[in-house]
């Protein structure tokens, strides 16, 4: 009789153990992988004049200002020099370098590199100029600036695609004493090297500029799921890479004045990731929205991240402050 009771007790205990194990194995069904570490991050991307770079592995950020017109240009320079006898000496250079560097928000330095008038080398010709936006183009202007042995005036425009058109008047004081000059010059060229930060010098995965977003050599796919846990495998499909854009808004000061307009810069954007949070400027005030979808970011190293934007404003209602959940790396 004792043996029978002992056998019943063993069987009953085993049954309880099986029930308990089955319950543990079923926990989390339908919620995705149990070992996923879902992190939350917030990026303040309200500034128009900078990119905020985000790193998935540690959630760190770094920011760098956008320089819309600074850099080295290459173009054609045509000039004429008035001579004492009333004639002109004309010349041109097809590969003339010109540099623009930022002094402050409203001032740049323009340097005509190694300028030659005929066989005479005049070295670098430089002047400071004011910079502003007019009809959505960057304008530069300097009037009778005395720089060493020169007096320089210039005015021109730089478009968002970084094509430059510049008129210059250079009075060389030594030539003026001999009734020569001024030198009248026109310059047309395009930027060949931007003054913006070299993005390959630091680690980052995605970046934010206002409502624009881009990747560091990666690509993005939008899923149809609205919960991170519901994306249980890395989906296949068309992962979209970044594209070049010359319509990054960096100056909104003249948005309501058609004679001023918006200041633009060149850059790259990922249209898929940017569409996760939208801002419609066709009417005022702007309309804001988000898709609630989960996005897959394939990084340059070949790893994957799941990301879902949960808000586009902070607790005070400031728009352009993005909160998102993400999993990285996706296992």
Predicted segments, located by residue:
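An anionic, turn-rich surface loop/hairpin at beta-sheet edges
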Residues: 136-155
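Positively charged n-region of N-terminal signal peptides that target proteins for export
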Residues: 1-5
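Surface-exposed, beta-sheet-biased, low-hydrophobicity segments with strongly acidic/polar composition
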Residues: 24-109, 142-147, 175-331
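A composition-driven surface/loop motif
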Residues: 157-160, 165-174
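C-terminal motif of bacterial Sec signal peptides marking the signal peptidase cleavage site
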Residues: 17-20
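Extended lipid/amphipathic-ligand handling interfaces
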Residues: 96-101, 124-135, 153-160, 189
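Sec-dependent N-terminal signal peptides
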Residues: 6-11
């Amino acid at each position: 009789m004792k043996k029978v009771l002992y056998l019943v007790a063993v069987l009953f205990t085993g049954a309880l153990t099986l029930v308990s194990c089955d319950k543990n194995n079923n926990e989390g069904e339908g919620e995705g992988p149990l070992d996923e570490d879902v992190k939350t991050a917030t990026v303040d991307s309200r500034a128009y004049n900078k990119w905020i770079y985000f790193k998935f592995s540690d959630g760190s950020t770094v920011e760098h200002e956008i320089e819309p017109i600074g850099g080295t240009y290459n173009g054609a320079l045509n000039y004429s020099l008035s001579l004492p006898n009333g004639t002109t000496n004309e010349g041109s250079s097809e590969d003339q370098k010109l540099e623009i560097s930022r002094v402050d928000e409203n001032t740049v330095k323009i340097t005509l590199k190694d300028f030659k008038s005929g066989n005479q080398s005049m070295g670098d010709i430089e002047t400071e100029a004011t910079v502003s936006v007019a009809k959505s183009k960057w304008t530069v202007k300097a009037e009778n600036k005395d720089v060493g042995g020169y007096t320089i005036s210039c005015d021109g425009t730089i478009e968002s695609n970084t094509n430059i058109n510049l008129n210059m008047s250079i009075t060389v004081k030594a030539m003026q004493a001999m009734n020569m000059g001024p030198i009248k010059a026109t310059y047309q060229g395009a930027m060949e090297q931007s003054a913006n930060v070299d993005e390959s010098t630091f680690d980052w995965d995605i970046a934010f500029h206002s409502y624009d977003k881009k990747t560091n050599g990666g690509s993005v796919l939008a899923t149809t799921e609205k919960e991170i846990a519901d994306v249980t495998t890395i989906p296949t499909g068309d992962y979209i890479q970044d594209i070049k854009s010359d319509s990054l808004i960096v100056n909104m000061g003249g948005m309501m004045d058609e004679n001023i307009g918006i200041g633009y810069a060149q850059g790259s954007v990922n249209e898929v990731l940017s569409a996760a949070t939208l801002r419609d400027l066709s009417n005022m005030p702007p309309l804001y929205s988000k898709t609630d979808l989960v996005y897959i970011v394939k990084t340059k190293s070949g790893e994957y991240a799941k990301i879902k934007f949960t808000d586009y404003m902070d607790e005070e209602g400031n728009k352009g402050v993005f909160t998102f959940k993400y999993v990285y790396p996706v296992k």
